[in-house]
Every structure is written in structure tokens, then in C-alpha cells.
């Protein structure tokens, strides 16, 4: 009987021992699988970042904040294949909104990447401007884009009219291309197609008089652009497929393709519902016959000379909603190929249509012109 009790007593003790050992083993395994470590980048990555900082030491102006600098450096770091850029930040985040101080070596930024502190001293900060830098071996290659403050915009500033190569990266701060490539003589500008233009709002006269320009910029992000007036004014050779550009915020397309003699692309999918001004848009775009049937022009106020001298144009725009157009002066002047009837157009608000069909009466006879008021119709051939 005593022996029996002994066996009974030993059983739970043994079980407890086994459970305890198993629990300790699992705990040990957990500790082995999840060791506490402080991650640090390798020396090569740190050197890459330092090299970027050295290259960009004169690439900022007085309109930049400390955080602007960090954000821009992150873009260059990403291009270099550096990972986990959320770990690259200001050491003192309270300085994020501080603007840069004018002068040489007066801005000492302290960055950190993981637990590594990296000092960054800006060599030269100019007032509202960043200077353009050119390659020492090729005067037509820009290695640092210049830009300046112009009213409420930060404007790309390119003075050399024979450039053939630009940096891959467009600085984040630039939001205006006003006359940026005005008078450019080059046909191809290497890397221009790679720019992230998602911050750009103004394209006014960007390629004005760039007579040879024909670089493919079809992938540009134009989602924030509000003004496209004169973008390709007299850009005689330009003919690239820009039909996928996002034009949903654009309000002004006046003279956009004025004199763009070779341009002939399908623009049917453009969202133009917010455009108010299409005056002179295709004036003297002699080859243009791209489809624009689906355009919502219900907010357009002016179509003056829109297709004047567009001698190839003959697309069906008979169902356009022209109910808000006030002025149609010279709209189809000398547009000798256009033959569609415009009788369904709503022209109740039109008060001017002088020269509407000048030198084009044979194609746009009285049965095809819009139902103008008599006082307007009187001058359509003048």
C-alpha cells in the first residue's frame, strides 16, 4: 500500500518537471529567434549619402527650409538605391520649418540615418535663387539645374539655348516652367523625359520658339498644371504623343500649339472641362488633324482664331457644347479642309465672330455655320 501511494505521489511531480522544462525551452527559443539588435547602415551606404551631400552643397536657396533640404536629399538617395529612407531625417526635428540663412557655410544641418549622425554644411545659399552648373567637359550639359523665385512660384531658369542634357532629377521645389526652354535650339534633351513634374503648375511658353525641339515628354505628370498657354508656340518640329497628359486642372490653353506646324496627335482623351480660353490654340498648326471630338468645352469663353490657318484640320466637333463662348473671331479663318456642319452649336452668348470663316466660305457655307444672331453673322466674312 505504501509503495502504491509512493507511485501516485511521484506522477504529478514528474509532470510538473516536464512542463517546466518545455516552457524554458520555448522561452529560450523565442529569445534566440528575436534578439534585441540596433540596426546600423553599412559604411558604403553612409559614404553614398555623404557623397550626395557634397554634390548638393550649393543646390539650395533661401526659399528652402531645413525639411525641404532633407526631402530633396532623399530623392537623390533613392536614385542611388539607398533603402529605408524614412530613417534619414533631421537630428533636431524642431528645426524642420526653419528657412536657410544667406551666405557661405552658414547653414549647419545635422542629419541622422538610423543611429549615425551626418553633418551637412551648405557652402553657398543665394537669395531666392539656385545657380545653374554646367559640366566642365561639356558646356551643353547641365549638372545642377538653376531656379529662382518669381512671385508665388519657383521657376526653372535655363539660360543656355543649346543644352543637350539635363540631370535626371527635377528639384522638388520647382513648380513653374514659364519660358524655361524659350528659344531652345536643340532637338533632343537627354533625361528630360525622366523628370518627375508632379509639382509643376505653370507650363506657360515653356517651349516657346523652340523650333527644333522634339523630345518625347509624353510621360510627364501634368496633374497640377493650370496654365498651358503657349507651351509649344512656334515649336515647329514638335510632334510627340502627349494625348495621355492630365489636363483636368488646366484653365488656359490659348496659343498652346500656335505655329506648331508638325504637330498632329490624338488629343481626344484630354479632360478640358475647366478650360476657359482656347483662343489661337491651333492657329497655324498646319498639319494638325488630331481627334478632339470628345472634348467638353462647356466652360470655354473664347475660341478666337482657334483653327485659323490649321489647313489640315477636319475633325467632327459638331456636337461641342459652346453655350458659354462669347467670342469666335477668326475661328476657322483659312482652315481650308474643315467641312463639318456646326448648325447644332449653341451660340446664344456669342457677341463677336468677325472673320469666323474668312477665306473659307466654300467649305463653311451658310447651311453649315452656327446659328449666329444677325448682328454677329454680318461680320463673319470680314
Where are these regions (language model features)?
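Negatively charged
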Residues: 2-382
Amino acid at each position: 500500500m505504501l509503495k502504491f501511494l509512493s507511485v501516485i505521489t511521484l506522477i504529478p511531480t514528474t509532470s510538473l518537471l516536464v512542463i517546466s522544462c518545455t516552457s524554458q525551452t520555448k522561452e529560450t527559443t523565442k529569445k534566440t529567434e528575436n534578439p534585441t539588435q540596433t540596426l546600423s547602415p553599412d559604411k558604403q551606404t553612409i559614404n553614398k549619402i555623404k557623397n550626395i551631400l557634397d554634390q548638393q552643397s550649393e543646390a539650395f536657396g533661401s526659399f528652402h527650409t531645413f525639411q525641404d533640404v532633407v526631402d530633396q536629399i532623399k530623392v537623390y538617395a533613392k536614385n542611388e538605391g539607398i533603402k529605408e529612407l524614412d530613417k534619414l531625417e533631421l537630428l533636431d526635428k524642431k528645426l524642420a520649418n526653419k528657412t536657410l540663412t544667406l551666405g557661405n557655410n552658414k547653414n549647419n544641418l545635422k542629419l541622422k540615418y538610423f543611429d549615425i549622425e551626418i553633418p551637412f554644411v551648405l557652402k553657398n545659399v543665394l537669395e531666392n535663387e539656385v545657380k545653374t552648373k554646367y559640366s566642365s567637359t561639356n558646356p551643353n550639359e547641365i549638372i545642377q539645374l538653376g531656379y529662382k523665385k518669381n512671385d508665388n512660384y519657383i521657376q526653372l531658369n535655363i539660360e543656355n539655348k543649346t543644352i543637350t542634357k539635363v540631370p535626371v532629377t527635377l528639384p522638388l521645389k520647382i513648380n513653374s516652367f514659364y519660358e524655361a526652354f524659350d528659344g531652345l535650339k536643340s532637338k533632343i534633351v537627354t533625361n528630360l523625359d525622366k523628370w518627375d513634374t508632379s509639382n509643376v503648375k505653370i507650363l506657360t511658353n515653356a517651349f516657346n520658339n523652340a523650333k527644333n525641339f522634339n523630345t518625347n515628354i509624353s510621360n510627364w505628370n501634368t496633374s497640377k498644371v493650370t496654365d498651358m498657354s503657349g507651351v509649344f508656340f512656334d515649336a515647329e518640329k514638335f510632334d510627340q504623343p502627349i494625348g495621355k497628359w492630365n489636363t483636368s486642372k488646366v484653365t488656359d490653353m490659348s496659343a498652346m500649339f500656335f505655329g506648331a506646324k508638325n504637330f498632329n496627335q490624338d488629343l481626344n482623351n484630354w479632360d478640358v472641362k475647366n478650360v476657359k480660353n482656347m483662343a489661337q490654340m491651333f492657329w497655324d498648326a498646319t498639319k494638325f488633324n488630331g481627334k478632339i471630338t470628345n472634348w467638353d468645352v462647356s466652360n470655354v469663353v473664347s475660341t478666337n482664331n482657334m483653327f485659323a490657318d490649321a489647313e489640315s484640320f477636319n475633325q467632327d466637333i459638331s456636337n461641342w457644347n459652346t453655350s458659354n463662348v462669347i467670342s469666335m473671331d477668326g475661328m476657322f479663318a483659312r482652315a481650308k479642309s474643315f467641312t463639318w456642319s456646326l448648325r447644332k452649336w449653341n451660340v446664344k452668348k456669342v457677341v463677336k465672330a468677325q472673320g469666323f470663316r474668312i477665306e473659307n466660305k466654300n467649305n463653311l457655307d451658310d447651311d453649315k455655320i452656327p446659328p449666329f444672331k444677325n448682328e454677329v453673322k454680318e461680320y463673319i466674312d470680314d
